[in-house]
């Protein structure tokens, strides 16, 4: 595709400033942006430490707290900023603003009373005064009950005690289970023997 053909296609779709080349004319699509009235005006704002310079001046003019800091030189202001952990770079007005805002914030923090939430008691009863007599009585009775309950029940059961309570249906079930397991055990070796075909 030649440049002149490309120029015709673009000129049909866009209207713009004609770019003069050696013997050829070409309409560029970005020229629409240049035709807009605000495209030539470029506004520049000077920012120092992410704050506009004009706002510094209005802040200093309106604030009455700067009088103690105005006497200091830039070097002393930087030392003050360093002692408070603030940024050290910038003009005198920047340093003044940082110091004043830091002091005003610290005054607000010190004047605010911090309310601690009340601790809630969950499932805790109020303390009760316990006497020695009360504790000794309860402990003795509890131990006594446990010992007497252990002495009443037999610890080891003998086989005759276990089998004495078998019912006739339990005996029939156990006998049938024993017979089936014996039959199954006898059939298993016959199935596992290899058969030899002649």
UniProtKB/Swiss-Prot annotation:
Transmembrane segments: 172-187
Residue ranges constituting the SAP domain according to the UniProt record: 69-103
Feature: transit peptide: 1-55
Keyword Transmembrane helix included in the entry's annotation: yes
GO cellular component, one term: mitochondrial membrane
Localization (cell): Mitochondrion membrane
Keyword Transmembrane: yes
InterPro entries: SAP_dom, SAP_dom_sf
Keywords, alphabetical: Membrane, Mitochondrion, Transit peptide, Transmembrane, Transmembrane helix
UniProt topology in membrane: Single-pass membrane protein
Disulfide bonds: none
SUPFAM superfamilies: SAP domain
Family per similarity comment: Belongs to the AIM34 family.
Record's protein name: Altered inheritance of mitochondria protein 34, mitochondrial
Protein species of origin: Saccharomyces cerevisiae (strain JAY291) (Baker's yeast)
Gene that produces this protein: AIM34
């Amino acid at each position: 595709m030649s440049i002149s053909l490309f120029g015709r296609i673009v000129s049909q779709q866009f209207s713009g400033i004609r770019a003069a080349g050696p013997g050829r004319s070409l309409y560029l699509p970005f020229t629409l942006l240049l035709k807009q009235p605000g495209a030539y005006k470029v506004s520049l704002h000077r920012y120092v430490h992410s704050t506009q310079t004009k706002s510094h001046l209005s802040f200093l003019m309106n604030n009455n707290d700067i009088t103690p800091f105005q006497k200091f030189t830039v070097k002393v202001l930087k030392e003050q900023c360093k002692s408070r952990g603030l940024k050290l770079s910038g003009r005198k007005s920047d340093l003044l603003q940082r110091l004043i805002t830091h002091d005003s914030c610290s005054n607000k923090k010190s004047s605010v009373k911090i309310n601690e939430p009340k601790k809630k008691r969950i499932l805790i009863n109020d303390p009760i005064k316990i006497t020695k007599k009360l504790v000794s009585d309860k402990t003795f009775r509890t131990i006594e009950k446990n010992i007497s309950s252990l002495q009443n029940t037999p610890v080891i059961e003998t086989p005759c005690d276990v089998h004495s309570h078998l019912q006739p249906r339990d005996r029939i079930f156990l006998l049938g289970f024993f017979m089936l397991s014996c039959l199954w055990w006898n059939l298993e070796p016959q199935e596992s023997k290899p058969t030899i075909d002649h």
